[in-house]
Amino acid sequence: EPRTPWDWV
């Protein structure tokens, strides 16, 4: 699945 910046915050 693609990762977005929201996954890292």
UniProtKB/Swiss-Prot annotation:
Keywords (A to Z) from UniProt: Amphibian defense peptide, Secreted
Superkingdom: Eukaryota
GO biological process, one term: defense response
Compartments where found: Secreted
GO annotations of cellular component type: extracellular region
Main location: secreted
Tissue and organ expression note: Expressed by the skin glands.
Function of the protein: Putative defense peptide.
Family recorded in the similarity comment: Belongs to the frog skin active peptide (FSAP) family. Tryptophillin subfamily.
Name of protein: Tryptophyllin-4
Source lineage: Eukaryota, Metazoa, Chordata, Craniata, Vertebrata
